[in-house]
Amino acid sequence: ESVLGGTDELLTGGLVDFAVTSSVPPGYLGDLLMTIPIVAAAAPHHPLHQLGRPLTQRDLRRHRHLVIRDTAQRRKRETGNWLGANQRWTFSHKASQIAAACMGHGFAWFPIDTIRTELDSGRLVRLPLREGAERRAELYLVHADRDCTGPAATRLAKIIRASVAKACAGRGEAGAAE
């Protein structure tokens, strides 16, 4: 598993046959797999939920932002650090980030499917943002060099495309063509 620049490094370094990534590195072509809604969420007892009004960017900046560490070796950045929060905790794993949010240690931007169980159980609640309550990220399947990809990797890429298309169709969303 890699995040942000780490995925680009794996592709450009020839260490993987293909990758699923939210950005296509310069010089590569990618096939759109799906679009993912991303939402801000925190535990129901978090102070942001206690304000009782739509939240502003200023409100978010005053609270701890939980972000995921970039796996890149050369250039690092944290995911979800768009707001420049005064406080932030950086995690290496999504599960740790989700657990910290559920415990009320801060808020984070999550792909909605990643926290579906926590939202359904009430352990996390979407933040009532005045604007920008939902973002979207696109996921692409990018081959390092399609002509050099072996039969197993080619088959796996085809299975991923088909699985994503089926899952998206089951939810009434547009997804990858098989």
Please tell me what each predicted stretch does.
Residues G13, D17-F18, G106-F107:
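Short, Asp-centered acidic motifs that coordinate Mg2+ and/or phosphate
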Residues G14, A144, S163-K166:
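Generic structural signal for alpha-helix termini and adjacent loop/cap motifs
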Residues E1-S2, T90:
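Glycine-rich beta-to-alpha transition loops that act as phosphate-gripper elements at the mouths
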Residues V3, A152:
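Conserved alpha-helical elements of sugar-nucleotide-dependent glycosyltransferases
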Residues E1, D8-E9:
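Short alpha-helix C-terminal cap/hinge motif
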Residues A41-H45, E138-P151:
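A bilobed periplasmic-binding-protein/Venus flytrap-type ligand-binding module shared by bacterial periplasmic
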Residues D8, P25-P26, G30-H105, F110-R135, ...:
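C-terminal regulatory
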